[in-house]
Design a protein with these regions (language model features):
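Amphipathic terminal alpha-helices
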Residues: 134, 139-160
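Oxidoreductase cofactor-interface core, primarily capturing Rossmann-like NAD(P)-dependent enzymes
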Residues: 8-117, 121-127, 133-134
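Structural signature of the Rossmann-like NAD(P)-dependent dehydrogenase/reductase core
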Residues: 1-3, 36
């Protein structure tokens, strides 16, 4: 069994991620050979992330580190892992670029021509909890995608 889930820093204060930890524990206890693929957030969700942080004409986003991955990279890695022998463990995956969360969202909005101002707010919430510097990035070795933000944005605009 190969299971795609969110990248989780344990212990976590984020309710969404606590639910993901519970799912992983069920898989581990099942006795079925498995590989859990923990992915950072997808680049394709940047629009909804910006929307969730919008407060009037500003977008409040944590300055914690962020390393989003393109869905095409996730699909390629997932297929590779699913076809390999189960590891009975975890594979972490992330995009090739790491930067503060607020800077990536600002870069995205600027590329869109969106006039909203992105404000670095250490108290900004994400999935119901506070984000610290390393909550959303792999802390150990991770398998990195190949598609950069610029390449992903170019492709996404061409497909629109």
């Amino acid at each position: 069994m190969a299971r795609l889930t969110a990248l989780i820093e344990e212990p976590t204060s984020l309710p969404y991620f606590r639910a993901k930890v519970a799912q992983e524990k069920l898989i581990e206890a099942s006795g079925i050979p498995y590989t859990i693929i923990r992915s950072t957030q997808f680049l394709e969700f940047l629009d909804s992330i910006a929307a969730s942080g919008t407060d009037g004409s500003m977008v409040r986003i944590s300055p914690g580190l962020f390393q989003p991955i393109a869905a095409d990279d996730v699909a390629a890695i997932l297929a590779d892992v699913a076809l390999a022998a189960p590891r009975n463990g975890v594979v972490e995956i992330a995009g090739p670029e790491r930067a503060p969360f607020n800077e990536i969202v600002a870069r995205y909005l600027k590329a869109l021509g969106d006039p909203r101002e992105v404000v670095s707010d250490p108290e900004a919430r994400y999935w119901g909890g506070r984000v610290d510097e390393h909550s959303l990035v792999p802390l150990a070795e991770a398998r990195l995608g190949r598609i950069s933000f610029d390449e992903w944005f170019r492709r996404s605009q061409a497909a629109a």
